[in-house]
Amino acid sequence: MDKFAEIRKRLKQKHNEWLQQTAAERIEQDAGIKMTARTIQGLRITRNSKNDESSLHVDSATDLEMDVTGASKFESKKETFDYRPNTSSSRIVLTPKSNDCKTEKKLVSGDDVTEISRPTSSSAVEISELPEVCVKVVFSQPCDVSRYPSDATKVRITKCDHANWRGWRSFLHALGICNREIQDSFLEQAASGCSAHVKDVVTAFDRGENLELLCAMAGVNVCLVNVSDEEIELIKISPEPLTCVVRIDFVGSEIKCLPCHATDAALASLFKTALRVYDYGRRIPWMHLSETVTFLSLDKTRTRVNVSNLCFDDGWRNIFEALNNDYPELYLVPENGDPEARSRCFIDPERQIEEEERYRAAKEAYLKRMNTPLEWWQEEVLTLTDGEREPKLDEFFFRTLLPRIIRQNAHCGDNPTEKLPMIGFGFDAIMKSRAERASQMSIGAKGNAGKEVGLPLRYKQHVINFRKREMHQKNSNIMTGYLPGGLLHDTLGGIVICLRLDIFEDTVISVYGIYNGMKLIRLICMICVYSGINIPGRPYFVYEVGEGILLTPGMFEEYFTGARTVSRLTSTHGVIHLGKLERCVRQFNNYLSAFKIKPGEIIDRSRAPRCKAKEKKFVPRSVGKGVFYASDLANYPFEINRHDKRSGLFHVGEIDFQAAISSIWPQMMCHYMASEDREDKQDDEKSKSDNFLVPEAVDPSLVIPSAAIYDCGMSKVNPENAKVKTRGNKLLLPCGMLEHCRATSLTKHRCLLPYLGVLACDLPYGSERMPACLGCGRLYPQQILAKLCAQVRCPAWPSTSDCLIRSE
């Protein structure tokens, strides 16, 4: 965080220097005064309407020199003032010049007031200084956008001193342009650019139309929060960062504009979210897009404004293609790298040349990548293989979830009431001693005689499997394999199918494919250490070779509650004997040979092999049809390899992986998946849910069942009313109970867990001063909920679109 704070401080300093430089250029243009200084702060012009006098204020400056040759161009004498202010605030009085008055120049000590003449008219902004293209993007949301800046505390609204202003002047004032003469020049230039009368332009501005012209005059990127139309508009006229957020309210037939003062983080989040429309379609949730996008281009040569509204039926796909074909250079927004890459590069001319070369190379690479067609599963695999075209399972880059490292000797005793450290000195000895007392342990229960005190909440995500070591000691033939979510259907955006198992002496490495319908969309590689600690909701496979069966351990009986019970799990998948497993492997090999698929390559299971009549009995549920069902894919392991050696993944000096489970799975984003290989449109309409990838929604009962004491009556909750509402300093929870916002009992409500957290990148607006989880960065309306997320080790909450609790 210190690194980002320094970067923000440096950027803000450069931004202030750029503002002062821009102010000096405008003063030179309007008043004819050339100013040069090593450093200058507080440079501004104020105007007194009573005596028609303007004052040039300088708070502080170093080696400031002013050339008033332009201001006194009617005089024959040229003078240059070496101005070094001695007081905290100094000013130069600018008096309008008349034909019969003479210019008096004097340097007054003390206040350092210099009285000079000034031209009567100020030059307007030239049309040649406007940007080539101005883009206006409108986000229409189904919910109430007007609540975002105020009630939801995403962007803080403060009172404005000029709240009684109306119309276009209010809008310019919200942009920070307060000088009435500059406002008038903007209005005249906007009218000349539109080839329209000034009165018509004023009328349009007062109705809230064509405000992007004023943004073009000011040269700033503005985000408008329109309260009446419930829209969020981004007006982008330069590649610079977003500098202003304006909230618009309609009062009668006029508009009222108020600036939204937000932090740099909120503005950056808001600007980046809006630009994700142009960066790459699948990186922004589809529900944040409107069907209509307005493109506004400023034509310098013809001095007119072209507005075109494009309506898309296929959402972001066509938007993405249209933007790349027209103006790809505007939408190349690098998400990684130096934050200063595209920020104020024109301050340093040498860096500008270097930046343009880098930008040109990035643009070519961007267009080349965009023009290369990819299948969805290839696209997902590329994210896992770091750009490798052909996926190599042994070269995957994993994101490992490890517990916090504790290297203290305080918890190394054999006391049954001790706290269990995650990783550290004496961990194996503690695990072994506790495995011997497995029958006396009751995790999550209150401390009674002969039972262990319930573990702290922060350990419940990792420390639940004490009996596996004991089972391994009783039967050395037991082998465990890690499977995300078991073989449960509709998890991880599709069906989870085991494709490969590599069984070592110390580790089981398993490869799983996730299928959306009949199409492979993702590959996941899991690593399971025998002495590792399991995570709730992620069952193990336990191979008891001696008895010849494949079963789910009974240790999960006390962790599966609610809808996903052990009985339902076992009734769905049953106990698979090795004979049946071998038959499944043989059937699947027949399927591979029918399509000439070699072991180890990516397979397409969209069609079933046409088996002979005598072989139809080997294809489940295919008698008389020859159809290969998607649900049957879960019964076909791809390949099982047993190795009589260690995996070699763990070396001396590294973290003790035998003390923690390596939960390897990349996070799946919620994005639209088009169904391209379906021929029947009616079936496509019936199975529309198959076209969407939904992140795994972890059931609260699988996360912290022992902590969720309150059942909350989740089965009786109406999905439409399943929201958290505020009543003073209390919260009305979805279960109907009223709790204080700072009550610790909030951690015991299962109705809160599935949907309250949201990532900042999923928001179409800024997120200032919202409590965030220190682990995953998810935003919560209350601090206690953010702490709860960190306590339960940041589980994979559902996305914002699937946040409501639905009754089963």
From Swiss-Prot:
A GO CC term assigned to this protein in UniProt: viral outer capsid
Chief location category: virion
Keyword line: Capsid protein, Outer capsid protein, Virion
Cellular localization per UniProt: Virion
Protein name: Putative minor structural protein VP5
